[in-house]
Design a protein with these regions (language model features):
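Pre-Walker A-like glycine/lysine-rich segment at the N-terminus of P-loop NTPase domains
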Residues: 1-80
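C-terminal lobe/lid and adjacent interdomain/linker elements of RecA-like ASCE P-loop ATPase modules
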Residues: 1-4, 293-370
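The Walker A (P-loop) glycine that initiates the GxxxxGKT/S ATP-binding motif of P-loop NTPases
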Residues: 33, 282, 313
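Conserved catalytic network of the ASCE P-loop NTPase/AAA+ motor domain
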Residues: 75-76, 89, 268-273, 300-304, ...
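Short beta-strand segments that buttress and anchor functional surface loops
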Residues: 81-88, 239
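Electropositive, glycine-dotted interaction segments
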Residues: 88-216, 221-224
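GG-anchored amphipathic helix commonly corresponding to the ABC/SMC/Rad50 NBD signature/C-loop
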Residues: 234-236, 241-245, 249-280, 290-293
Length: 370
């Protein structure tokens, strides 16, 4: 596997997380835990950092309902949010302190990037303070240079995906712009245009996606991807049945099949188009058991070159991974705690049970507690 994009993260004072100190991240990070343990909040940290990088800190706070909703137990309990991430064995780092205002917003109290040449300066990295601007973090400045620009570029290469909406108004089922194909959007609203682009320019990846969908849905032959005749700037997701020449579009697919198509596209797209960090909250939702095992294989394959962070409630999906891939979330004293599993303490158990079975037997933690 390649070196993970991120190697450590520290989170303090964010939503249900009072303190997670220097958590090591691997190429694969599978979060398990009961409802309310804070798995989604941990993944939400990355969305928060992305918003900060994009210059949308104030917009994020407003949409969340104010700073009190983001701070751990509110501003009476927590006086700041502190986030710190490191890249490439801590050579480059980024940290930000956010404090509440009287107007129930957040302001940047301190922000810095770090560079650590451990051979020349073994004791500590040197820091470069960043100045905030117009209420937004300095890392959002597109004119930044040096280490700041390096970190800003890395923060822009993450993407958080939610493919939960497969209703009649799902973005995946709507007509998309043909030209909207630079990357797969977080809700797969441009799934048709992105697949069309892959078919035209990245045939090998398109073929892998098609074959993966055929394994989950044997009735599926191929996608029909052409700009609409009435408006050549638009395209919709259509497909061909192996035993019928009737018209089929995304609405003709089951919810699980449509989600799997989006997931297969995400994990099998060419490396040059893929985000450096892929984050997905409960990707197994609505999938058939066989599709869940396929999903595990897709994640492991993608993680050879891309860092993956997923949360799951599926014991079957958990079975596809090694103990060291797993982060267990528990709520201890009203705060989210994360710990990584290790193979050695589980060695005798794993001779008789799978990882998912051990989780169901409450041998791993991450289960509801009375």
């Amino acid at each position: 596997m390649s070196v993970p994009e991120l190697d450590y993260i520290t989170v303090k004072g964010f939503k249900s997380i009072a303190s997670i100190e220097k958590l090591r991240l691997r190429s694969i990070n599978v979060l398990i835990g009961p409802n309310g343990s804070g798995k989604s909040n941990f993944i939400g940290v990355f969305a928060f950092l992305h918003a900060i990088r994009e210059g949308r800190l104030q917009d994020y706070v407003a949409k969340a309902g104010g700073a009190d909703k983001i701070l751990f137990f509110g501003s009476k309990e927590t006086n700041e949010i502190y986030l710190r991430i490191s890249f490439e064995d801590e050579v480059n780092q980024y940290a930000i302190h956010l404090a509440p205002t009287s107007a129930d917003s957040l302001y940047v109290a301190r922000e810095a990037v770090y560079y650590w040449d451990k051979l020349r300066y073994p004791e500590a990295p040197y820091d470069v303070p960043i100045s905030s601007r117009n209420g937004e973090a300095g890392i959002s400045d597109s004119k930044s240079k040096g280490i700041t620009d390096w970190v800003r570029t890395r923060l822009g290469r993450w993407r958080l995906y939610h493919f939960h909406d497969t209703s009649s108004t799902s973005p995946m089922k709507k007509v998309a712009d043909v030209a909207d194909n630079r990357f797969l959007r977080s809700d797969a609203s441009n799934l048709a245009s992105f697949l069309y682009f892959l078919r035209e320019r990245h045939e090998n990846s398109y073929s892998l996606i098609r074959k993966a969908v055929q394994r989950v849905g044997p009735f599926f032959d191929d996608f029909i991807l052409e700009p609409t005749q009435l408006n050549p700037d638009k395209i919709r997701l259509e497909w061909k049945h192996k035993r019928s020449d009737r018209f089929f579009d995304a609405s003709s697919l089951s919810d699980g099949t449509l989600r799997f198509i989006a997931l297969a596209t995400l994990f099998l797209q060419p490396i040059i188009l893929r985000p450096s960090v892929i984050l997905v909250d409960e990707p197994e939702l609505g999938l058939h058991p066989y599709a869940i095992t396929m999903l595990g294989s897709l994640i492991k394959s993608a993680a050879q070159k891309t860092q993956v962070v997923v949360s799951t409630q599926s014991a079957l999906l958990l079975d596809q991974f090694e103990p060291e891939d797993v982060l267990v979330a528990d709520r201890i004293e009203d705060s989210t705690h994360l710990r990584r599993l290790e193979s050695e303490p589980l060695k005798s158990w794993l001779e008789e049970y799978s990882l998912g079975q051990l989780w169901e037997k409450n041998q791993l933690g991450g289960r509801p507690a009375l």
